[in-house]
Each structure stands twice: as C-alpha cells, then as structure tokens.
Amino acid sequence: GIFEVPRNIDFQMDANLKEVLFDKMVFNNMNGKLIVKDGKVDMKNLSMNTMGGNVVMNGYYSTANVKKPEMKAGFKLSNIVFAQAYKELDMIQKMAPIFENLKGNFSGSINVLTDLDATMSPVLDTMQGDGSLSTRDLSLSGVKAIDQIADAVKQPSLKEMKVKDMTLEFTIKDGRVETKPFDIKMGDYNLNLSGSTGLDQTIDYTGKIKLPASAGNISKLMTLDLKIGGSFTSPKVSVDTKSMASQAVEAVADEAISKLGQKLGLDSAATANKDSVKQKVTEKAAEKALDFLKKKLK
C-alpha cells in the first residue's frame, strides 16, 4: 500500500545502506541525503547501484495529499543494462518494450513528475517528463518493425544489427513517449526516425532510410521515406511509393540529361552540374537549330 509520510516529523539523515529491496528491484550501496518534512521526503544526490549500472536521484516523494501521492525526480543514469531495465521496470515494459530485444547498456538523464498508485507505482497516464539516452554499442534482433524495414529494402542482414553512438531525446506527455528526430547507423545504412509510442504499445513513427551504393540498383533512389504504425507486437511498415517514384523519375531524367549533354559535346566537368547541363543543353540545341536553318536558307 501507500507509504504515508508523517506530517509531524521533521528530520534529515545521511543514508548509507548496503542493500534495499523494492518490488522487483534491488538497490545496492545506496547513499545520499534524505530530508523528511511536511509529509514529503526529499532525496538529495541519492546514489545507488541497480540494473547493472548506477543511478543518482534528486527529487521528492510526497503524500501531502494522501489520496494523490506524487513523485517528482531527476535521474542520472550510467551504464544501465537494457534487458535488466525491461525486466525490473513495469514502466519500460509498457512504454518501451523494445528494450527486451536490445543488448548493451545506456546512459543519460530522465526528469519525471507523476502521480503514484496504491502500490507506489507511477500512474503512467499522469506522467510528464523529458530526457535523453545514449548508447555507444548496441545490438538488436527480433524487433518486428526492423525486420519489416529489412524486408522492404531487401537487406535481411539488417534484421540482426549493431548500432554505434546513438542518442535519443524524448518527452513524456498524455501517456505517450515522443522522440525528437534521431539517427541510427545500421552498417552502411542510415535511418532517421521521429514519432511516439503509447501506453497501449501503439507506434506512430515516420522516417527516412538512406541507402548505400552497396544496395545495388535500388540505391539509385538514394533515400526512402518510411512510416511505422501498428503496435510493437504487430507493426505496419510502409514505404512512400510516391517518394520512390519521384526519385526514380529524377534519377532517370538526370541520366538522360547527362547523356544528351555528352552527345552535344559538353565535357564531363560540365555535366556534373545538373542545372548547368540543362542550360548548356538548351544553348547547344538552339545553336544546332540555328545552324540547320542557316543551311536551309542558303
């Protein structure tokens, strides 16, 4: 049940606890300052080892309104293991189930304000916050949305991939985690995504994937627009065919202009600039037409 902080207690202490058990979580080497006053516990630089890494917390837990306890806190995270965070935090299971499929660790910071329920767990649809996470070395497999992207670009190797140096900035509001545009480098492929995920595990992301020359003929399209919808368990990935068609037409047009420029005697340096080629092709065509007319008029 709810731990009600007594209103008539006013004291502070330096905590130094070897092990603390809370729900499914274990906190080791917990130390920092606790200030109890007016039905509220303030936590100052409360450091603890958990989830394979370290967390430093600054914030408060308040039962000033016992029917609506709340927590406001900032967390500094260092080397937290993705899989352990998924296993131990119900919030992660509901809002970021992809953590189950990630191997590696992450660091960063999170700031949250949330009501708490009778089990002292966050009431997620009341949560507001923001933060950023970064990882230097991440591998993943079994993520259905990524599998569908791999199928769309005909590169099955992307289904099991390693990601280097990724940073993710996000906000939490109205039961959704919204991410700012972020880049994922998947081997020779570059994926840029932004969007949100919800408590109901729905996904609403848009993005672009940039293809390398090694992708073969499809790489002539350079960049594909993507949309990821559905849910984590049943994602729906679609490729913007209008974007593909537009880029395909442009690529063919560029090649045609280049060949025409070469036939009209333009050097390779001139054909490197598309706008320049268009202008020079027009000029050359006009010259050819004038020459033809002069010959006919003689």
Place the predicted regions along the sequence by residue:
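Small-residue helix/turn framework positions
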Residues: 5-267
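N-terminal leader/targeting segments and the immediate start of mature chains
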Residues: 1-8, 296
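Protein-protein interaction and targeting regions used for scaffolding, dimerization, and localization
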Residues: 242-298
